[in-house]
Regions:
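Interdomain motor-coupling "hinge/lid" segment immediately C-terminal to the ATP-binding subdomain
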Residues: 129-251
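Short glycine-rich substrate-engagement loop in P-loop NTPases that contacts/grips substrate
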Residues: 55-87
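Conserved P-loop NTPase "ATPase switch" module shared by AAA+ and STAND
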Residues: 84-102
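Accessory nucleic acid-recognition modules appended to NTPase machines
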Residues: 201-376
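Hydrophobic positions on the alpha1 helix immediately C-terminal to the Walker A/P-loop
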Residues: 36, 40
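Conserved lysine of the Walker
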Residues: 33
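Structural recognition of the conserved hydrophobic beta-strand(s) that form the central parallel beta-sheet
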Residues: 92, 117-123, 145
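N-terminal pre-Walker A segment at the start of P-loop NTPase domains
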Residues: 1-16
Length: 446
C-alpha cells in the first residue's frame, strides 16, 4: 500500500521555485526520507540519480578532489553512468553525514550551479554533525524537517471518503455523527500503529496486530543499536535511561520531566547531553514551559522546566508495552497514560504546522496547566488536550481569566464547534490546524 506523503508537495513547490537552494532533509530514522526523495525523483524528473555515501564510500574521493560543482556533476554522472542534466535530473545525496565534503558542496551548488536539483539527507544527521564538528552550510540550503506519517495522511489511505469530506469543509460546525465516529475509530487505530511507515502499512494492509507490533519493535531495536553506534560511550546508558523513562514521565499527572524518575539522585547536568542527543536524533520533542504568553513566545521560555514526548505515538505505545486492544477499546485503569497518548498524538499532528515556532506549555502559580501554547502569526494560542469527551477541568479557564486571549482551543473527542472564542475540535482533526485558523481568522477575528 502506498501512503501519500504531504512532503512530496513541499518538494514539488521547491522544484519550480525561484532562487532555489539544495534541500537538506532532516528527520528521525525510519520515517521514510529515502522513499520520499526517490518517489519525488521518479515522478517529477526525467532522471533520478541517487548517491549513497554509506554504501558507496568510494564516492568520497570525488568530493575530496574538487569543489567545482560543474566538475562534480561530470564525475558523478560518469561514476553512476547516468545523465545529470540541469532541470531534468534530481540528484539525491543519501547518508550525507558520511561525507563532510559532500555536505560542504551544497554551498557551491547553491552559489555556482543553482540550476541543479539536489536533495540531501542522512541518518541521525543532527547527531553526526555535532559529533564530528561538521559545518552545515546555513543560508545555502533549504532545511526541511520530515515527520512520521500524520493522521491526516493515515486517514487519506484508510478512509479517503471521510478525508475528502473534511477537506471540503469551509466552516466550523458540528460534524455528522457518522463522520465523527469514523474519525474516532480511525484515530484510535492510528494511535496503535503510529506514523512509522512500516507499521502503518502493516495495519492498513490487515497483516495483523502481531505484524504491527513486530514492525514497531524492530524500529525500537534499531534505535537501541543507534545509541551504541553513534553516541559517546559515557552517554549511552544515560540516553538509554531517558528513552526508557518516557512512559513513566508521561504517566504522571504532572508531566514535567523529572530527573529522579530516571534514577534516584539524577541531576540535570548529568543528563543534558543525553537529552540533546535524543533531540538531535529526532526521537523526542522537548516542550518548554513559559513564564507568560508574551510575544515573541520564545523570549519567555523557562529552560529548566519542560516535558518530553516521543516522536511517534505508536513507538511510545510499544515502548510502554501498552497492548493495542487497550487503545482501541479503553479499559477502566487506562487513565493517566491515555492522557499522555492523547497529548503525544496532538503534538505529533501540530509539529509540522507550527514551522519554526515550536510549541510550549503554561502553568499557573497554582495547579493549572495548559498542555500546549503556540505562536500563530500575531497571536499566542493556548491548546488544551482531553483524551475523550470528559472536558472537566479549569486550567483553560484560569488561562483565559488571566490573559484573555482572542482564541483558545480544546482538542478532545467532542464535536467541532466555535463559541465565544473557544474552538472545540475533535483531536483527529488537529492536523488541519492551518485550515481551522484560516476560517477562524476570516470569520471570527476580533
Amino acid at each position: 500500500m502506498r501512503i501519500e506523503r504531504e512532503i512530496i508537495n513541499q518538494f514539488k513547490a521547491w522544484k519550480d521555485a525561484p532562487n532555489r537552494k539544495p534541500i537538506l532533509l532532516k528527520g528521525a530514522r525510519q520515517i521514510g526520507k529515502t522513499w520520499a526523495m526517490e518517489t519525488f525523483g521518479k515522478e517529477c524528473f526525467k532522471y533520478c540519480v541517487k548517491f549513497d555515501f554509506d554504501r558507496q564510500p568510494e564516492l568520497k574521493s570525488v568530493f575530496q578532489v574538487t569543489k567545482d560543482p560543474k566538475r562534480l556533476v561530470k564525475e558523478l554522472a560518469l561514476y553512476q553512468d547516468q545523465p545529470i542534466i540541469a532541470g531534468e535530473t534530481l540528484m539525491i545525496f543519501d547518508e550525507i553525514q558520511e561525507c563532510e565534503e559532500a555536505l560542504n558542496s551544497l554551498k557551491y551548488f547553491c552559489e555556482e550551479a543553482p540550476e541543479y536539483h539536489i536533495i540531501a539527507a542522512g541518518s541521525l544527521l543532527g547527531v553526526a554533525v555535532k559529533k564530528r564538528k561538521m559545518t552545515v552550510p546555513v543560508g545555502k540550503v533549504k532545511i526541511i524537517d520530515m515527520y512520521p506519517i500524520s493522521f491526516k495522511e493515515f486517514l487519506l489511505a484508510s478512509d479517503a471518503r471521510t478525508y475528502e469530506y473534511i477537506e471540503s469543509l469551509e466552516e466550523i460546525s458540528h460534524l455528522p455523527e457518522i463522520v465523527l465516529n469514523k474519525l474516532r475509530t480511525e484515530y484510535r487505530r492510528y494511535q496503535v500503529s503510529g506514523g512509522m511507515p512500516e507499521a502503518v502499512v502493516a495495519l492498513l494492509d490487515n497483516q495483523g496486530i502481531s505484524e504491527v507490533e513486530s514492525a514497531l519493535q524492530d524500529i525500537l531495536d534499531l534505535y537501541e543499536l543507534d545509541f551504541s553506534k553513534y553516541a559517546e560511550p559515557r552517554e549511552i546508558p544515560r540516553i538509554h535511561a531517558i528513552w526508557h523513562s518516557l512512559p513513566a514521565q508521561l504517566s504522571k499527572e504532572n508531566r514535567k520531566f523529572i530527573y529522579k524518575v530516571i534514577k534516584t539522585g539524577a541531576r540535570s547536568k548529568d543528563y543534558e547531553d543525553a537529552l540533546m542527543w535524543l533531540e538531535d536524533a529526532g526521537m523526542i520533542y522537548r516542550v518548554y514551559n513559559i513564564s507568560k504568553p508574551g510575544m515573541p513566545i520564545s523570549a519567555y521560555e523557562e529552560t529548566d522546566a519542560f516535558k518530553v514526548y516521543a516522536c511517534d505515538c505508536g513507538l511510545l505505545r510499544r515502548l510502554a508495552h501498552l497492548p493495542a486492544t487497550v487503545v482501541t477499546d479503553p479499559i477502566a485503569n487506562y487513565t493517566e497514560f491515555k492522557g499522555a497518548m492523547a497529548e503525544n498524538a496532538v503534538l505529533q499532528s501540530i509539529m509540522p504546522l507550527v514551522d519554526n515556532q515550536k510549541p510550549y506549555y503554561w502553568t499557573s502559580p497554582g495547579t493549572a496547566e495548559v498542555e500546549f501554547v503556540i505562536q500563530w502569526g500575531d497571536e499566542i494560542i493556548p491548546i488544551e488536550v482531553k483524551a475523550e469527551e470528559n472536558i472537566s477541568g479549569s486550567s483553560l479557564s484560569v488561562y483565559f481569566k488571566t490573559y484573555a486571549p482572542h482564541h483558545r482551543m480544546r482538542f478532545s473527542m467532542l464535536n467541532l464547534q466555535y463559541n465565544e472564542g473557544l474552538f472545540s475540535c475533535p483531536a483527529p482533526l488537529a492536523g488541519w490546524l492551518d485550515k481551522w485558523m484560516s476560517i477562524i481568522n476570516n470569520v471570527y477575528r476580533i
